[in-house]
Amino acid sequence: MEESLLSIIVALDAKSQYDALKIVEQLDPTLCRVKVGKELFTHEGPSVVKKLQEENFEVFLDLKFHDIPNTTAQAVCAAADLGVWMVNVHASGGRKMMETCVERLKAGNYQTQLIAVTVLTSMGREDLKDIGLDIEPVEQVKRLAKLTKESGLDGVVCSAQEAKILRELIGQDFSLVTPGIRPEGSNADDQKRIVTPKQAMLDGSTHLVIGRPITKAENPTEMLKSILASIA
């Protein structure tokens, strides 16, 4: 598959494998990838990943691992054993944790991409202050993105509003995976830092994570095609 044609990652915000498969029945694996998060994976385990792969979807396993280096690396390799396209960790776990994950993936000759979460898109300045970080979200994102790049990972999860800044800071050979994407007229839901698909791509995002606007649409396929047309 051509990477440029797979910029959209559909978040499968489903509680069961049945519901997830009903969603992907209405999607085309040549037009998007899918994301399996904590709720779905906790309910269904690895079997849901395998089922999605049987339907020819590449899977981003969004479990945001965050633990001591060895434990995190073992979890990342376990995800890679499932054959997922991408998996993530929390950059706040630190350099040693991230470097250990990269080393283990290379040692195992895995093709799975590893990215890091910088600042959760639901968090604003006051939220960071609550956990002892008296800093603007964008400054923390820059700090953690730079650390992620230095640690050898493939990219970061970041708000589209930070994408342009990160491109200048880090360069082109680095994935910027962006949640908080809402087509024109959509509800912001619980994402604080949101941007439209077209603007996100213009700002330098490489992949757009879109959930409810597609999965809750009356016709998910038509919504997906509409979004693709808007960023073409």
UniProtKB/Swiss-Prot annotation:
One BP term from GO: 'de novo' UMP biosynthetic process
EC number: 4.1.1.23
Classification via InterPro entries: Aldolase_TIM, OMPdecase, OMPdecase_AS, OMPdecase_bac, OMPdeCOase_dom, RibuloseP-bd_barrel
Active site positions, chain numbering: 64 (proton donor)
Keyword Mitochondrion: no
Keyword set, alphabetical order: Decarboxylase, Lyase, Pyrimidine biosynthesis
Superkingdom field: Bacteria
Annotated catalysed reactions: orotidine 5'-phosphate + H(+) = UMP + CO2
Pfam families reported in the protein's UniProt record: OMPdecase
SUPFAM superfamilies: Ribulose-phoshate binding barrel
GO cellular component: cytosol
Pathway(s) the chain acts in: Pyrimidine metabolism; UMP biosynthesis via de novo pathway; UMP from orotate: step 2/2
Root EC class: lyase
Family: Belongs to the OMP decarboxylase family. Type 1 subfamily.
Subunit structure: Homodimer.
Function as written in the Swiss-Prot or TrEMBL entry: Catalyzes the decarboxylation of orotidine 5'-monophosphate (OMP) to uridine 5'-monophosphate (UMP).
Protein name stated in the entry: Orotidine 5'-phosphate decarboxylase
Species name: Acinetobacter baumannii (strain ATCC 17978 / DSM 105126 / CIP 53.77 / LMG 1025 / NCDC KC755 / 5377)
Record gene name: pyrF
